[in-house]
């Protein structure tokens, strides 16, 4: 299980579910705050993913979250809907892409 944001970023391509992304064309911006935070984005295009550090000028969705909470989310210790409802997870942009996010990545084992 990843313990740092860098480990999450490095593991994303391996956790990616290409079948769930067929026909998709979207950019997810991640603004991870606090200790160990980072800014990175994923470009998803028809079943392929590219993970890049930094910011994208025109993402379809921006996800903002504290680094510790994001790692808990990735590791299955924090429910995404509960995180959103409690304000730990902030979403700006296309909400339907947020709903699809869970199917795009296999659970971390």
Predicted regions and their residues:
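Feature captures hydrophobic
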Residues: 1-109
């Amino acid at each position: 299980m990843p313990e740092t944001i860098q480990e999450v970023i490095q593991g994303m391509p391996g956790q990616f579910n290409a079948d769930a992304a067929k026909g998709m064309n979207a950019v997810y911006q991640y603004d991870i705050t606090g200790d160990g935070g980072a800014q990175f984005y994923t470009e998803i295009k028809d079943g392929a993913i590219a993970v890049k550090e930094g910011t994208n000028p025109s993402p379809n969705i921006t996800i903002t979250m504290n680094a510790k909470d994001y790692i808990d989310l990735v590791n299955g210790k924090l429910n995404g809907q509960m995180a959103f409802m409690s304000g730990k997870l902030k979403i700006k942009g296309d909400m339907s892409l947020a709903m699809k996010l869970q199917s795009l990545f296999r659970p971390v084992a």
